[in-house]
Amino acid sequence: MEPVDPRLEPWKHPGSQPKTACTTCYCKKCCFHCQVCFITKALGISYGRKKRRQRRRA
């Protein structure tokens, strides 16, 4: 790897962000788009609010 300028913030390092924006698509290409897409789409991990399940009526 190339040395990174220590004066740059971590989020401004070259290659730290993909050139295209993230989408809501779940195809294989979009699931491996970036690290965030992989964690949320491919692994299904989200730390947001959980939706309440409705109980089945008998």
Curated annotation (Swiss-Prot):
The modification N6-acetyllysine is found at residues 28, 50-51. Keywords: Acetylation, Activator, AIDS, Apoptosis, Host cytoplasm, Host nucleus, Host-virus interaction, Metal-binding, Methylation, Phosphoprotein, RNA-binding, Secreted, Transcription, Transcription regulation, Ubl conjugation, Zinc. It is found in: Host nucleus, Host nucleolus; Host cytoplasm; Secreted. GO terms for cellular component: extracellular region; host cell cytoplasm; host cell nucleolus. A motif (Nuclear localization signal, RNA-binding (TAR), and protein transduction) lies at residues 49-57. The record marks 11 as: Essential for Tat's translocation through the endosomal membrane. It holds the Pfam family Tat. Residues 49-58 are annotated as: Interaction with the host capping enzyme RNGTT. One of its GO terms (molecular function) is RNA-binding transcription regulator activity. The modification Asymmetric dimethylarginine is found at residues 52-53. The keyword Secreted applies. Acetylation by EP300, CREBBP, GCN5L2/GCN5 and PCAF regulates the transactivation activity of Tat. EP300-mediated acetylation of Lys-50 promotes dissociation of Tat from the TAR RNA through the competitive binding to PCAF's bromodomain. In addition, the non-acetylated Tat's N-terminus can also interact with PCAF. PCAF-mediated acetylation of Lys-28 enhances Tat's binding to CCNT1. Lys-50 is deacetylated by SIRT1. InterPro entries: IV_Tat (IPR001831), Tat_dom_sf (IPR036963). GO terms for biological process: positive regulation of viral transcription. Residues 22-37 are annotated as: Cysteine-rich. Residues 1-24 are annotated as: Interaction with human CREBBP. Signal peptide: none annotated. It comes from the Viruses. Residues 1-48 are annotated as: Transactivation. Residues 38-48 are annotated as: Core. The transactivation domain mediates the interaction with CCNT1, GCN5L2, and MDM2. The Arg-rich RNA-binding region binds the TAR RNA. This region also mediates the nuclear localization through direct binding to KPNB1 and is involved in Tat's transfer across cell membranes (protein transduction). The same region is required for the interaction with EP300, PCAF, EIF2AK2 and KDR. Belongs to the lentiviruses Tat family. Transcriptional activator that increases RNA Pol II processivity, thereby increasing the level of full-length viral transcripts. Recognizes a hairpin structure at the 5'-LTR of the nascent viral mRNAs referred to as the transactivation responsive RNA element (TAR) and recruits the cyclin T1-CDK9 complex (P-TEFb complex) that will in turn hyperphosphorylate the RNA polymerase II to allow efficient elongation. The CDK9 component of P-TEFb and other Tat-activated kinases hyperphosphorylate the C-terminus of RNA Pol II that becomes stabilized and much more processive. Interacts with host CCNT1. Associates with the P-TEFb complex composed at least of Tat, P-TEFb (CDK9 and CCNT1), TAR RNA, RNA Pol II. Recruits the HATs CREBBP, TAF1/TFIID, EP300, PCAF and GCN5L2. Interacts with host KAT5/Tip60; this interaction targets the latter to degradation. Interacts with the host deacetylase SIRT1. Interacts with host capping enzyme RNGTT; this interaction stimulates RNGTT. Binds to host KDR, and to the host integrins ITGAV/ITGB3 and ITGA5/ITGB1. Interacts with host KPNB1/importin beta-1 without previous binding to KPNA1/importin alpha-1. Interacts with EIF2AK2. HIV-1 lineages are divided in three main groups, M (for Major), O (for Outlier), and N (for New, or Non-M, Non-O). The vast majority of strains found worldwide belong to the group M. Group O seems to be endemic to and largely confined to Cameroon and neighboring countries in West Central Africa, where these viruses represent a small minority of HIV-1 strains. The group N is represented by a limited number of isolates from Cameroonian persons. The group M is further subdivided in 9 clades or subtypes (A to D, F to H, J and K). This is Protein Tat.
